[in-house]
């Protein structure tokens, strides 16, 4: 597990504060069962108005539990804070994010509410196309190695802001792969020892080339659609044949929480946050 002990303790402390509109996301959740370590905890909210109140409630809970907290950034729709236990520290970021997603949120006793792994993977495609960060490229390699091919994610990403075409998404990711210096890849924490800058770059370029071939051959009606199997894992359609594939479209509408077998899911109710 990529979380530090401090991050795990913080998440357990704050699990009771998570809800349908305040949930865990970002690189920490994507990599929670993989190798890469993240320096921050991302907590997403559906609206800017919710952010400050959620941050205050979380910080109050952490203070009561004996953690040391300090607000570093306080602006409308965004709060950053450093949290420590005397031996180590991490950053928590609260901010607003579009609630348009392909799956309902998932909730369990340990983590609170979080984005479904498929949505985390689609969001990583969006991040890798929108900014030049070595950790995003490393995460693409990890997604392909541990979870699913990138092609279906690229097609699905067209259904979320900024609604780039799949081809533009591919082009932007490729540009970022080639433009990131080797030392930035080397600075990414927790990666396997054989994940050198050269390895990550070569793997990412191969994966993007494969994804490009897939999107160029995919039926036009899959634009903005996520194709998944019965286990809700994104899949490629072979020769355009849909078979038992499930097609999901991103939506803003609230949905009932699912109960994936890997989670001990609890019901929402008046006694739960």
Put a short name on every predicted segment.
Residues 1-273:
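Compositionally biased terminal segments of proteins
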């Amino acid at each position: 597990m990529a979380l530090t002990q401090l991050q795990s303790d913080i998440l357990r402390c704050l699990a009771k504060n998570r809800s349908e509109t305040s949930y865990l996301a970002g690189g920490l959740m994507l990599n929670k069962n993989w190798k890469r370590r993240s320096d921050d905890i991302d907590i997403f909210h559906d609206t800017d108005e919710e952010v400050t109140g959620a941050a205050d409630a979380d910080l109050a809970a952490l203070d009561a539990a004996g953690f040391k907290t300090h607000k570093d950034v306080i602006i409308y729709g965004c709060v950053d804070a450093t949290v420590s236990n005397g031996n180590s520290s991490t950053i928590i970021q609260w901010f607003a994010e579009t609630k348009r997603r392909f799956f309902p949120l998932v909730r369990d006793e340990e983590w609170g509410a979080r984005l479904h792994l498929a949505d985390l993977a689609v969001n990583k495609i969006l991040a890798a196309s929108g900014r030049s960060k070595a950790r995003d490229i490393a995460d693409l390699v990890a997604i392909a190695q541990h979870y699913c091919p990138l092609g279906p994610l690229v097609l699905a990403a067209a259904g979320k802001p900024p609604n780039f075409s799949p081809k533009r998404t591919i082009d932007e990711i490729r540009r970022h792969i080639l433009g990131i210096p080797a030392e930035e890849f080397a600075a990414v924490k927790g990666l396997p020892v054989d994940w050198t800058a050269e390895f990550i770059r070569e793997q990412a370029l191969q994966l993007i080339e494969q994804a490009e071939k897939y999107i160029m051959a995919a039926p036009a009606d899959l634009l903005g659609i996520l194709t998944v199997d019965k286990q809700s894992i994104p899949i490629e359609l072979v020769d355009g044949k849909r078979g038992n594939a499930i097609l999901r479209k991103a939506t803003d509408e609230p949905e009932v929480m699912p109960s994936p077998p890997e989670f001990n899911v609890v019901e929402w109710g008046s006694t739960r946050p």
